[in-house]
Amino acid sequence: MSCRKPANYRYGEHTADVLVQAFGCTLEEAFKNAAVALADLTYYSERVEPRMAKKVEVEYDDLEGLLFKWIDELLFLFDAEKFAWGRNIEVELRQGVGYRISATLHGEMYDINKHGFTGLIVKAMTFHMMEIKKVDDYWVLQYVVDI
């Protein structure tokens, strides 16, 4: 199924922070692209080889909280474990009492010589300017990270 999303993701200007807009024909694809956008802020995800897989599961009552926990968990994965994920990410989103993401990220241990460094260090996820909406036939996830 194709849709008319403008891109997988894009960045916007924001004082001392970075605004990210991730797009997807489905919510799952938008959450995947939000993860790739986060990675590409610090290193070059296209250089990552799928040598290992990490499972990530997060849940929350609403989609905004789920997005916050998703990005926050990915920041922890990179900061604490030095795991660099590439663009091969499987995301399953379920709705019940709340929302739950079960994901598998394929990647390898971060190596600055291989994966590079863009010059940005993402410090934290914020709720500032967060927005999740459906536009025509695609989803937009907007979030701001502190750098």
UniProtKB/Swiss-Prot annotation:
The keyword tRNA processing applies. Pfam families: Archease. The keyword Calcium applies. One of its GO terms (biological process) is tRNA splicing, via endonucleolytic cleavage and ligation. One of its GO terms (molecular function) is calcium ion binding. Coiled coil: none annotated. Keywords: Calcium, Metal-binding, tRNA processing. SUPFAM superfamilies: MTH1598-like. Ca(2+) binds at residues 17, 146-147. PANTHER family: ARCHEASE (PTHR12682), PROTEIN ARCHEASE (PTHR12682:SF11). Belongs to the archease family. Activates the tRNA-splicing ligase complex by facilitating the enzymatic turnover of catalytic subunit RtcB. Acts by promoting the guanylylation of RtcB, a key intermediate step in tRNA ligation. Can also alter the NTP specificity of RtcB such that ATP, dGTP or ITP is used efficiently. This is Protein archease. It comes from Pyrobaculum calidifontis (strain DSM 21063 / JCM 11548 / VA1).
